[in-house]
């Protein structure tokens, strides 16, 4: 699905339209819809599949995305891929929030002070191991 960014993705402020494609229930791919030489193509992860994950969406983001009780909100975190997938890093402090009802999206920058259990370079393997231990 295509989304219009109402608040930019950090480092990609020049991109205002993106395409989100689900790979599976865990991973998705986000691509910038631009001809810029600084293209956007990143892997995202559903944080709720990895860990307990909860944060307050700031009021200004609620307003920008026109969120209400009928909105279908999707949240993803950026994955920095490594050669070995389990060595990849997840950024839980800058989630991407999408309202699929109206096609709006935004990145939210969370404070480490407010969310001390969230990291910006949490290794994916620490969550994979936990999942294996549950099995």
UniProtKB/Swiss-Prot annotation:
This is Flagellar assembly factor FliW 1. It comes from the Bacteria. Belongs to the FliW family. GO terms for biological process: bacterial-type flagellum assembly; regulation of translation. It is found in: Cytoplasm. Pfam families: FliW (PF02623). Interacts with translational regulator CsrA and flagellin(s). Acts as an anti-CsrA protein, binds CsrA and prevents it from repressing translation of its target genes, one of which is flagellin. Binds to flagellin and participates in the assembly of the flagellum. One of its GO terms (cellular component) is cytoplasm. Keywords: Bacterial flagellum biogenesis, Chaperone, Cytoplasm, Translation regulation. Transmembrane segments: none annotated. InterPro entries: Flagellar_assembly_factor_FliW, Flagellar_assmbl_FliW_dom_sf. Gene3D superfamilies: BH3618-like. Its main location: cytoplasm. HAMAP family: FliW. The keyword Hydrolase does not apply.
């Amino acid at each position: 699905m295509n989304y219009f960014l109402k608040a930019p993705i950090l480092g990609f402020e020049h991109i205002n339209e993106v395409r989100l494609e689900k790979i599976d229930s865990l991973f998705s791919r986000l691509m910038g819809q631009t001809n810029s030489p600084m293209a956007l193509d990143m892997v995202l992860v559903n944080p709720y599949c990895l860990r307990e994950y909860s944060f307050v969406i700031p009021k200004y983001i609620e307003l920008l995305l026109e969120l209400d009780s009928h909105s279908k909100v999707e949240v993803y975190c950026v994955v920095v891929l490594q050669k070995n997938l389990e060595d990849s890093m997840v950024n839980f402090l800058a989630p991407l929030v999408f309202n699929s009802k109206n096609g709006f999206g935004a990145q939210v920058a969370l404070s480490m002070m407010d969310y001390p259990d969230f990291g910006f370079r949490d290794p994916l393997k620490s969550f994979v191991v936990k999942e294996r231990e549950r099995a």
